[in-house]
Amino acid sequence: MKKTHITEQKFADLGLKPQVTEGLEKKGFEYCTPIQALALPVLLTGQDIAGQAQTGTGKTLAFLTATFNHLLTTPEHEGRKPTQPRAIIMAPTRELAIQIFNDAAPLIASTGLKAALAYGGESYDKQLAKLQDGVDILIGTTGRIIDFYKQRVFNLNNIQAVVLDEADRMFDLGFIKDIRFLFRRMPEPKERLNMLFSATLSYRVQELAFEHMHNPEHVVVEPEQKTGHRIQEELFYPSNEDKMALLQTLIEEEWPDRAIVFANTKHKCESIWGHLAADGHRVGLLTGDVPQKKREKILEQFTRGEVDLLVATDVAARGLHIPQVTHVFNFDLPDDCEDYVHRIGRTGRAGASGHSISFACEDYAINLPPIEEYIEHAIPVSDYDASALIQDLPAPLRMRAPRTQQRRTNTGGTRSGNRKPQGRRPRQPRQSAPKQS
């Protein structure tokens, strides 16, 4: 393992409960990442923390390890019923909640503690049945957690550990009132272990920590640069007319093992999906309108390698832990500078390298200057040869049409339908202009 990603701190030397160490070792976790090495020694003394770390740094394992260990070392409240959670982990999106639950699986197995999910978009009754079976750790989104609370499925009187993940995103999505509602129904901050993690410790996030935590210690892991030194960035200036052909030509040239294509609107994502699906790619669509069960299935297929391309809005840009994403395509430059960082942060994770390709088109080139100012460097620019772009593209599929997803077929078909890689070279690299000081 590379020392740039893994420290010399061993989990086995932290004084964790044997059941916790066993769960970590079974998943191959021996050495801590920087955020784990900084946060865990503090948390294991019972001290609250407010941690700043980008996604992909191992913060999920940090707070899961601390939560499970705390529950094993702290006696539960006298008279607690099995349906009353002892710990609560709040996430901004259901996808992130599900991912946290999945990441907790080895610790659930090794410790015997019970975890349950609560998030919108899935059957209330199914989640209710799981909760009624008993729960030690409740993982979910604030809206559904409040629904269960108001229906008196559980109370929060026995909470001994609290995690607020992606706190800055919670603010962005307008969940701060829900968070405060839940905090005010828990025991006093000094009576529980509190963990807050955020990509940025902005003033509003620090204010939340001050209000609902007990003298939290600030733990900061700054990336060497906002976009990650293992991510190769590249920028094109296509016309609106050339964008789709350029995307498909670059996909053919790059031949990514696993790639995410981001666009700014649901309708644009559907259009991109239609073009790629018609061309025979195994492609999934992830937007806010896709039903929850479908979203989960698509993410599972993408993670297992059954889908090679994922077209998504920014709903998938934060918090999801999808391994081995080799490429990110920004079909549209995002309106929010932080979204650019979070999008391309889907690749180049856990010490791996990645490639980010962005289009500064007629509609969204205006977003480039603030993005480059935010990331503190100019994105290298490549020209392209319009005559080298793919021309023989089929008509796009419509959303009502069946999704054949035939990028790789059992009959030995190629990854892009009947067209084999042609070795096109649309790029004409050029030096980016020096940034004005």
Curated annotation (Swiss-Prot):
UniProt xrefs under CDD domains: DEADc, SF2_C_DEAD
Localization per Swiss-Prot or TrEMBL: Cytoplasm
GO annotation, biological process: RNA catabolic process
GO CC annotation terms, alphabetical: cytosol
Reactions catalysed: ATP + H2O = ADP + phosphate + H(+)
Pfam family, one: DEAD
EC number in record: 3.6.4.13
InterPro entries attached to this UniProt entry: DEAD/DEAH_box_helicase_dom, DEAD_box_RNA_helicase, Helicase_ATP-bd, Helicase_C-like, P-loop_NTPase, RNA-helicase_DEAD-box_CS, RNA_helicase_ATP-dep_RhlB, RNA_helicase_DEAD_Q_motif
Motif (DEAD box): 165-168
Biased composition (Basic residues): 417-428
Top-level taxonomic group: Bacteria
Region feature Disordered, mapped onto this chain: 395-437
Similarity comment: family membership: Belongs to the DEAD box helicase family. RhlB subfamily.
Subunit structure as annotated in this protein's UniProt entry: Component of the RNA degradosome, which is a multiprotein complex involved in RNA processing and mRNA degradation.
Name by which UniProt lists this protein: ATP-dependent RNA helicase RhlB
UniProt source species: Vibrio campbellii (strain ATCC BAA-1116)
Gene name in the database record: rhlB
